[in-house]
Amino acid sequence: MKAITVANPENPRSLELTDAETPTLNDGEVLVKVTAAGVNRGDLVQAQGKYPPPKGESEIMGLECAGVIKDPGTTGRTKGEEVGCLLAGGGYAEYVAVPEGQLTPVPKNLTVEETAGVVEVACTVWSNLGMTAGMQAGDKVLIHGGSGGIGSFAIQMCKAMGCEVAVTAGSTEKLEYCRELGADILINYKEQDFAEELKGWADIILDVIGGPYLEQNIKTLTTDGRLVVIAVQGGPKGTLSLGRMMPRRLSVTATTLRARPRPMKAAIVRSTVENVWPLIENGQITPNITATFPLAEAAKAHDLMDSGDNTGKIVLTM
């Protein structure tokens, strides 16, 4: 099969379409012929040699894809069935082996290609806001990086579930994009201090920046507020005052989806399909795929994401 590999470990953009072994199936896995794969920040970091896959998982990049079951193995699934796939790796290839519990249906109103840009972001956003932070209607939610793939999905999901949403982004154009998705409060982090603008406002914060925002995030939370950190794009280290947290009973969770064990991922997929797929199918959440590249041009897709110029989701097609 064809797959994307990093030709030179010292050059994260040296992505080449090369020949690779088609995966062999373990018990409980299906072989999926990939139609399209979503591009995520984790793929860029893996290409830099800083985010290796969990032990035993594919070394090929790609944390989500969608396609058609080629071989159902021992699962009892149907050959030719269209599915979305949550992956620990392997999506940047013609074929990928997927644990049955990490398969999703294709939403009734989406194409297979659109589904490729939904699975990982939906599972990430729901598992952190819905399952970990316990988000409920009426909550006030701050989303950092509101114009990206995670942020644009989170805005729509929060609004669909009856929350008030504030976002940070770095340009007027990106903030306008967030407004069109439903964001209520828009903050340009290059010109405004979100902690001063929103001091004590947020019930929940979804953060992809990490250490540099830690102290400001704590200032922004209200009593019983929850900070969920899912990436460290700005670095892993910051200052945290427990003295500011304890009187207001604040909590901080730092987590990734990729490293979770398969049974936990299967539970997340089930809960996401149950709670989020209906919002997609009734049109309250749309995938917002704003750029598509053929698999062979994965380096261009990574360049676009790394530039910060894109909004929404980037997808690779086979």
What are these language model-derived features?
Residues 21-38, 50-90:
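Glycine-rich beta-strand-centered segment in the early N-terminal region that forms part
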Residues 76-77, 135, 221:
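Short, well-ordered loop/turn sites that connect or cap secondary structure elements
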Residues 45, 82-145:
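NAD(P)H dinucleotide-binding glycine-rich loop of Rossmann-like/cofactor-binding domains
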Residues 147, 155:
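N-terminal Rossmann NAD(P)H-binding glycine-rich loop of SDR-like oxidoreductase domains
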Residues 152:
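Residues forming the Rossmann-fold NAD(P)(H) cofactor-binding site
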Residues 161, 172, 212-284, 310, ...:
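Glycine-rich phosphate-binding loop and adjacent beta-alpha segment
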